[in-house]
């Protein structure tokens, strides 16, 4: 059963009317409500606030990394463990084929349902997850395989055990290693891009975002609590943080914004997966046309330009 957000209440009501009209074979009513639905979708999704976009990024039905792996990859084989401590189910590493291109895919996975959410630690990786990702990238580099990374996390896990095992070092190590990895690296934010948890698999030749994804240094809830000591200020914090793709594109923090269905990726996973596939394959093709030195130099310049500004 479809899940509707608060601002989609009118759309939900019209959808129910369409179902009822179908049930009694009232085709005239179906056509009428179908037109109403199209208008309401255009009206609602044509003027979304930043907070509403955040809600879509966190939608419980939104496709996660594993959904895209199933839609995108052929002959996929999962890589487990960091060879040092344990396997982290919050980070997925698969080697397989995407559109005829051998690919190493790394993705953060939130999980569905109570048991699976707990298993995946709500998409918050531990250091062993980031070290597993590094292991996968090193393997990809050894065999000259492009890397696709799917970002979707509220943040790196801040627990005591994670800190004791070197959470900050694991993230920093990935930033360092990925910046010089000798294969094409593409990162795409598919949902939430939470702070260092996102950066740890976000260092790449190209960083893109889906239309209804977000990327932030802190969650709006955390920002609201710190700056205003008031959880009701979350919408204000969302706007102030500039976390939407259009904001980040304007500030040159991301390279591209990928289209997804107007009503969200959760309504049409296949179309969204195709957009990811096309972007990845086209990006790899363009990067392969460069020499290794040119590719690494371009990546270095892209990364060092982040945060640069001029005072007027």
Swiss-Prot record:
GO biological process: fatty acid biosynthetic process; malonyl-CoA biosynthetic process
Reaction(s) this enzyme catalyzes, per UniProt: N(6)-carboxybiotinyl-L-lysyl-[protein] + acetyl-CoA = N(6)-biotinyl-L-lysyl-[protein] + malonyl-CoA
GO cellular component: acetyl-CoA carboxylase complex
Statement: the UniProt record of this protein carries the keyword Disulfide bond: no
Cellular location(s): Cytoplasm
UniProtKB keywords: ATP-binding, Cytoplasm, Fatty acid biosynthesis, Fatty acid metabolism, Lipid biosynthesis, Lipid metabolism, Nucleotide-binding, Transferase
Broad class of the protein's primary localization: cytoplasm
Domain called CoA carboxyltransferase C-terminal: residue spans: 36-286
Pathway: Lipid metabolism; malonyl-CoA biosynthesis; malonyl-CoA from acetyl-CoA: step 1/1
Gene Ontology molecular functions: acetyl-CoA carboxylase activity; ATP binding; carboxyl- or carbamoyltransferase activity
EC number: 2.1.3.15
Oligomeric and partner information: Acetyl-CoA carboxylase is a heterohexamer composed of biotin carboxyl carrier protein (AccB), biotin carboxylase (AccC) and two subunits each of ACCase subunit alpha (AccA) and ACCase subunit beta (AccD).
Family according to the record: Belongs to the AccA family.
Stated name of the protein: Acetyl-coenzyme A carboxylase carboxyl transferase subunit alpha
Species name: Sulfurovum sp. (strain NBC37-1)
């Amino acid at each position: 059963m479809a899940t509707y957000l608060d601002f989609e209440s009118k759309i939900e009501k019209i959808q129910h009317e369409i179902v009822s009209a179908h049930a009694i074979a009232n085709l005239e009513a179906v056509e009428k409500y179908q037109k109403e639905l199209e208008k309401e979708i255009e009206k609602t999704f044509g003027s979304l606030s930043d907070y509403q976009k955040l809600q879509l990024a966190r939608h419980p039905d939104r496709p996660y990394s594993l959904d895209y792996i199933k839609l995108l990859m052929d002959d996929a084989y999962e890589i487990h463990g960091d060879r040092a401590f344990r396997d982290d189910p919050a980070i997925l590493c698969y080697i397989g084929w995407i559109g005829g291109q051998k690919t190493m895919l790394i993705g953060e996975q939130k999980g569905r349902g109570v048991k699976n959410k707990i298993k995946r630690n709500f998409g918050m990786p531990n250091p062993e997850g980031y070290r597993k990702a590094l292991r996968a990238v090193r393997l990809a580099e050894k065999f000259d395989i492009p890397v696709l990374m799917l970002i979707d996390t509220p943040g790196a896990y801040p627990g005591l055990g994670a800190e004791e095992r070197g959470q900050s070092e694991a993230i920093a190590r990935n930033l360092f290693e990925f910046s010089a990895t000798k294969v094409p690296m593409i990162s795409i934010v598919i949902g939430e891009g939470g702070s260092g948890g996102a950066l740890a698999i976000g260092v790449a030749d190209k960083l893109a975002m889906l239309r209804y994804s977000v990327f932030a240094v802190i969650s709006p809830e955390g920002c609201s609590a710190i700056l205003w000591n008031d959880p009701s200020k979350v919408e204000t914090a969302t706007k102030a943080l500039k976390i939407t793709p259009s904001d980040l594109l304007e500030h040159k923090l991301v390279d591209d914004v990928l289209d997804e269905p107007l009503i969200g990726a959760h309504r049409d996973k296949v179309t969204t997966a195709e957009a990811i596939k096309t972007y990845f394959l086209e990006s790899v093709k363009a990067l392969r046309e460069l020499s290794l030195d040119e590719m690494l130099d371009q990546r270095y310049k892209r990364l060092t330009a982040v945060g640069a500004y001029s005072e007027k």
